[in-house]
Each structure stands twice: as C-alpha cells, then as structure tokens.
C-alpha cells in the first residue's frame, strides 16, 4: 500500500533515531517482541548491501512519492520523486563480497528454504515455458511459495494422497512414509503440523533433524531438540507454533511451560496413533514392526 514521507520517518528511521542500544533496552523484558518488529528485519539488508533505496508512494489520495536512501550509516536522505503506481520498491546495491546473492540459483535456494510457506505470495522472476526447443520467460509471475500449506488445513479436507504428496515435496528422495499424524490444537497452546513416521534406514543418525520448525509459516530451524522428545526426533515433518520461544538456550527451552506441554502433547498423539493401529489393524502393525520398533525401543529407554 506504500508509505508517506511521515511513515518512512516513523517506521524506517525509528531504529536509527533511537540507536540500537535504546531499542534493545526498550524490549529487554520482552525479547520475543523484537521478532517481526517492523523495520528491524529491513535493516538486515545492510548485511549484504552497501546502499539501500526505498521508492514508495502511499495509497492515500494525492500522496507524494518519495525516495529514501541510506548507506548503512546513521545518515539518510529523503526526497520527492515521481512514481505512477502505489506501493514500494526496495533496491539493494550489493557489496562486492556478497555478489553470490545476485545469482539466481542462490536466491532461489534461500527463498525455497525460508519463504516456502509464507502466508503471502512471493514472486521471483517470471514463469518459463518451452518454445522452439528452448525455455523462454512468460508474462506470468513465478510465485515460489505455497500460502496455504497442508498443515494449515483441516484433516477432514484431506485425503491420504494429499499427505503423501506433501511428504514427497518435503523429502523427494525418501521412501513412502509408514503413516502420519496431523497436529491441530489451539488451547492451552497453539500448535499445528504434520509428523510422519519414516521407513528407518540403517544409519539412524542420517534420519535426525528432519522435522522443520515454523512460526506462523516462517521457517525457523530443523533442529528441534528440546521441543520434540528425543526419541521422536527421528520423525519427519513440520510443526508450527507461535508459542515456542525462538531466542533462548536449549536449557531454557526445556524449562518453558509451553514447550513442556507441546512435547507431552506430541508424545501422547504418537502413542495414541500407535495404539490405534495395534488395536484396529494388527496386521498392518506387524507388517511395519521392523520400522516401528526403533521408536518404541528408543522411547522405553
């Protein structure tokens, strides 16, 4: 929707005005409030850019377009410019030692890792199609993310093939999963996700760190020790929760009340699923026992 000069001054310059120390002092008692703070993420652009420009025009009627320029120092300039349409263009002038971030494959891999399931569409270039034996760009935006991923949907809306397809998208080289558990709870904590029981290979270590942690569909990490019980870190899948503290040590994480509840909840859901298969489909349970026993034995230890 674009910004006015006053909004640029308020939202983009506020950290520069107050200084990093003042900013951190303001949020020292609520560190989680820093995450997602408007303007803070924007300033990380200077980690790779020697200069950043914002050319923006507000949606407000009669608004004047402006250009904000800064080289990463406390100094910046704001000037009036011409811009036909509303919205904002952010232009990064990449440092010489960060030119790798101009490579299409590098950008694509980073977007796929961190923005794959963002709730707003992210376009990277244009879609390509084959024409006369070669790939050519079309006029259609190449949207790289899925804004409504499987774990945000209700289980009643999904079929087995939907879960298997999602698993193949996450782990293209993996065998078909044994079964899965769809997590969806909003009280006393918020947690959604899908956990898959994989076919266990001979080297168990290679199977760890396959659970991806998200916060409101933003990728955080694939190291979930302390959140998921140790014996279940062999599982694959996705968990998404805004109630997991993201800026704390593992020891603090393990003492957090919400994390304890989430860990207990996941253990119970896995236990309930195994028990249901054992009671309702003993043949399937026995057929999959060689793959399942590692989880059960590890859990007993």
What is the role of each PLM region?
Residues 34, 52-75, 95-98, 105-301:
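GHKL/Bergerat-fold ATPase module in large chromosome/replication-associated machines
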Residues 1-96, 100-101, 109, 116, ...:
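GHKL (Bergerat-fold) ATPase N-terminal catalytic module, capturing the glycine-rich phosphate-binding loop
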């Amino acid at each position: 929707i674009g910004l006015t000069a006053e909004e640029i001054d308020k939202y983009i310059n506020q950290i520069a005005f107050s200084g990093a120390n003042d900013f951190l002092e303001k949020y020292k008692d609520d560190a989680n409030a820093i995450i997602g703070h408007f303007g803070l993420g924007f300033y990380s652009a200077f980690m790779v850019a020697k200069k950043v420009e914002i050319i923006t025009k507000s949606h407000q009627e009669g608004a004047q377009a402006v250009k904000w320029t800064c080289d990463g120092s406390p100094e910046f300039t704001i000037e009036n410019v011409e811009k036909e349409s509303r919205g904002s263009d952010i232009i990064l002038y990449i440092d010489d030692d960060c030119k790798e971030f101009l490579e299409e494959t590098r950008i694509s891999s980073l977007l796929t890792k961190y923005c794959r399931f963002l709730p707003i569409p992210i376009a990277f270039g244009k879609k390509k199609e084959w024409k006369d034996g070669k790939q050519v760009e079309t006029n259609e935006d190449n949207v790289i993310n899925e804004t409504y991923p499987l774990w945000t949907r209700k289980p009643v809306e999904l079929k087995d093939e939907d879960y298997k397809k999602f698993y193949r998208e996450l782990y293209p080289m993996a065998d078909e999963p044994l079964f899965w558990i769809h997590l969806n709870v909003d009280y006393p904590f918020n947690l959604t996700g899908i956990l898959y029981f994989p076919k266990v290979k001979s080297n168990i270590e290679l199977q760890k760190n396959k659970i991806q942690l998200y916060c409101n569909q933003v990728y955080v990490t694939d190291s979930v020790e302390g959140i998921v019980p140790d014996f279940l870190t062999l599982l694959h899948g996705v968990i998404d929760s805004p109630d997991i503290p993201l800026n704390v040590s593992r020891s603090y994480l393990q003492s957090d009340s919400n994390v304890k509840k989430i860990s207990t909840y996941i253990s119970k859901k896995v236990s309930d699923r195994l028990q249901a298969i054992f009671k309702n489909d003993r043949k399937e349970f026995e057929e999959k026992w060689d793959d399942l026993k590692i989880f059960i034995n590890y859990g007993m230890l």
